[in-house]
Amino acid sequence: MFARLITVLVCLGFSATLLAQTGHPAKGSWSGDLTPASGSASHVRLLLNAKNGELTGSVNPGKNGVEMSKVTLDAATWTMTINAPMKEGALVLTGKLSNLGSWTNRKYIGTYTMGNQKGKFEFIIN
C-alpha cells in the first residue's frame, strides 16, 4: 500500500512539471543568416527577452551589439517584426515563428531589409 502511495505521488510530481510553462516562445538566443538577393550571407545572433508582455532584445549581443528599437508580435499569426538601427542602415526583420512547441527546433523565418539591401533570413533557437 505504501509503495502505491509513493508511486502516485511521484507520478503527480512529474505531471506538474509537464504543465509548467516555459515562457514566451520568442524569448531566447537565436542564430541564423541574413541572405541577400545577391551576395553572401551574414551570420547574425539575436537575443530576445520578454517582460511584462513586451519583447526587447539586441542584435549580435556583446561589445558591439545593437539594441532593438522595436519588437512586435501578432499572436494570431505568430508574425514577428524586429527593428534595429544598424550601422549599415535600419534593419527590419519580418517573419513567422514556427515549431513553437519545440525546445530546440523553434524557427523564425522571413524577409528583411537593411539599408538598401533586401533578402531572406532563417533563425533557429539555440
Question: What are these model-predicted stretches?
Answer:
Residues 1-9:
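Bacterial N-terminal signal peptides that target proteins for export
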